[in-house]
Every structure is written in C-alpha cells, then in structure tokens.
Amino acid sequence: MAVSALNMTPYFGGYPFQGQGRVNQLGGVFINGRPLPNHIRRQIVEMAAAGVRPCVISRQLRVSHGCVSKILNRFQETGSIRPGVIGGSKPRVATPDIESRIEELKQSQPGIFSWEIRAKLIEAGVCDKQNAPSVSSISRLLRGSSGSGTSHSIDGILGGGAGSVGSEDESEDDAEPSVQLKRKQRRSRTTFSNDQIDALERIFARTQYPDVYTREELAQSTGLTEARVQVWFSNRRARLRKQLNTQQVPSFAPTSTSFGATPTTSAAPAPNMGMSLYSSQSWPSSGAYENHAAYGGSVASMSPASSTSGTSSAAHSPVQTQAQQPGTGSEFMTSTYGVGSSNATYPSAAYSMPQTPATSAEQLRSQFASAAASGSHHPSTWDSYNFAGSFFPPASAAGNHISGYHHQVDQKSSMMTTAPTYPYFGF
C-alpha cells in the first residue's frame, strides 16, 4: 500500500528546553523567572574569594556577567547569597557571626527587644548601619530560633523523618559561604609627567592606533604599564574627535567687511553746475549698477570705496592734491597714487553742492541731459582718474556712451600734480 507524502504527519519532538527554559549567549541554561541555584551562587562567591575575576567566572560557569556582578555585590553588602527582589528585599542577616551574636544576646537577656539588639550590634562594631540587619529580620530570626525545636505545622507532624531529611538538604544548600570578599579599591588617577606626555604625543602624531609592540616599547620608555598607554591613546582619540567636531561647527558671526565707506569731502564751488551728482559708494566688480544715494549735496565723485579690512600695512591709496584751474577761480582735485594711511579706504574728491535731493529717476536723467547739452562738466569727475587714451573708443564710434561728457586730460593740470599718475580703473 502506497502512502502519499501529503498524508504523512510530520514528527516533531519539541524543543530541547520547553516552557521557561532558555539558553544564554554563553551556552548556559537558565529558567526565566527563577533565581540562580544556590550551589552556583556559592561557587561564584568562592571563586571570587579565590581571586578569580568576574569575567572569568562568567565564562567558566556560563552565567551572564550581570548576574555574577549582582550576586557578588549583594554578598559584599549583606553577606548573603540568598535571592531576593531587587530594591524591595529586606536586608538579610549578614553572616553566621552576626546570627551567633544575636543568639548570645537573646540568651543573656531574654526580654531584650529587636531594636536593642540592632543597636548593640552597631555599638560593638560587629556591623555598621549600612549592612546591619533590620529590626524585622532580627525578630524573624528570633522567632525561627525559638520555634525550631518543635514544629506544630501539618507537614511537620505528618512528614516524619522524610521532612527532616529534606530540611537537612535544604539547610545545606542555604548555608551561607564563610568567606570574606575584599572590597574593591578605586584606582587613583594616573598623573603623567611632561616627558611622558611628550613621548605619547610623538607616537600619537605618527599613528593614532599603535600596535601592541609600539605600546610595549612606549610603556618601557615612559615607565607606564601597557594598559595605561592603551587607555591614554583611547582618551586622546576621543579628545581629538571632540576638537574636530567643535571646529566643524560653522560660525554665524557677521563678517567685518563693510561696503559703505565714509566719503571724505572738501568744500570747493563747482562752476556752472547747479545739479548734485550722485555718489557711487563702491565700484561694482560684476558690472551691476548699485543704488545711488545723495549725501545732502556733498557727494563722492565716482570713487571706488574698498572694504575696511584689518590690514594695517601701508597701502596704495589715491592721494588728492588741490590744483588751481587756469583761467577760472575754481579748484579741482587730482587723484594720484601715494602711500596712504593704515586703513585701506579710498577717499576721493567731493564737492559741496546745493542741497537738491534726488527725488526720482526722471530728475536725474533730466539733470544729466542738461549737463551733457551744455557741456558744463567738471574735469575732476572723470579726468581725475587719468584713463588711457585707448581705454575709451573714439568719439565718433558707435556705442560710445562716455563721449558726451568725456574730455581729454589737460596737460597743464596733469603737470601740476605732485607725483606721477597711474591709471586706476577701480576694479
């Protein structure tokens, strides 16, 4: 008779540890929700008393490191390996010595109270206030010792000898180990000398992750242990990462560049010019025209105002000299190159005009049109820069927008300057 595979029911024997049973990462078996058995607890305490490190105990007994540390800390504080609720358990009677001392006090003074026994234990130096048993624990111990001779419970009456054997085994498991753990001494901070720091910094500049041979050589040369050297490199890398993260944070402080340099003015009447010229506070490098503002009639004449920077060297800046125009009673300014002051600002010639505020673009266009038609253009506005002749196209060329109000440089006025002039384009 052929049996189809679809009709066969799969056989599953179950997991090796069913229910609450689990296997930890070390391969040890534990039952979730139940405390560790007492014989393993006692073995943990005995191995710790023999000087075995908790991490080695954890690997050998296949118990988690947290469980080992918790058992050792509780035994060090209370002297008991019995399990209890974390944070809510009552202090256990610490050691058999304390139990025997309580029995002696009870036998010597039968009417003594539990709080008096606790006070006498602290006064005698048997325990301190931190690990002294509570009053309720002492009372529970006294009741247990007084009723240990006869048991009036149903199990005690009916159990007979079996109950006594079980109690002996249970008492053997619950017996506290008579060992004394050494208190952990906190290691003092290592103070490095200047020579040690210099040697460590030299190696750190070469490599941030030295190998074991480099660490051993460095430990021998500095007189430190290899572990201290390794910890120093770890701390030094952390400090370097913190410094790099601090430097990468962008600073939101405003820049110190100011594009509005204060123009310097010199009072000189402008002949045949009843309009007020607009001022250009900075020469645009990108070719865009900036907004024009009238300084109350006293304006700068097309001068590039550089940003006020922190350079305090002797910078080349236009130096203006006054010259008398022949045939007229007016003065004009000629800009030449010389060694200027410490700041890199470029003051240029300006004239005090009648205070005619520029209200609209139409007024400006009409004023420039009238000035171009009358030809009343002062030479210091454009000619003071002494542009080369090849800079502007001929006047007859198409597209020459400067020809309407550009004049050639007067040779006589150029000879009156105190220093040789150079072309300055303001770019």
From Swiss-Prot:
Regions of compositional bias (Acidic residues) in chain numbering: 167-176
GO cellular component, one term: cytoplasm
GO BP annotation list: chemical synaptic transmission; nervous system development; neurogenesis; regulation of synaptic activity; regulation of transcription by RNA polymerase II; salivary gland morphogenesis; segment polarity determination; ventral cord development
Main location: nucleus
Alphabetically ordered keywords of this record: Developmental protein, DNA-binding, Homeobox, Nucleus, Paired box, Segmentation polarity protein, Transcription, Transcription regulation
Bias-annotated ranges (Polar residues): 318-336
Lineage: superkingdom: Eukaryota
Disulfide-bond pairs as recorded: none
UniProt DNA-binding region: 19-145, 185-244
Residue ranges of the region described as RED subdomain: 97-145
The keyword Phosphoprotein is annotated on this UniProt entry: no
Molecular function GO labels: DNA-binding transcription factor activity, RNA polymerase II-specific; RNA polymerase II cis-regulatory region sequence-specific DNA binding; RNA polymerase II transcription regulatory region sequence-specific DNA binding
Region (Disordered): 142-192, 248-267, 300-336
Chain segments carrying region PAI subdomain: 22-78
Organ and tissue specificity: Expressed in the posterior ventrolateral part of each segment throughout the embryo, including head and tail segments. At first expression is restricted to the ectoderm. During germ-band extension, expression is induced in the mesoderm.
Localization per record: Nucleus
Low complexity compositional bias, start-end: 142-156, 253-267, 300-317
Functional note: Expressed in segmentally repeating pattern to define the polarity of embryonic segments.
Family note: Belongs to the paired homeobox family.
Name of the featured protein: Protein gooseberry
Name of the gene encoding the protein in the UniProt record: gsb
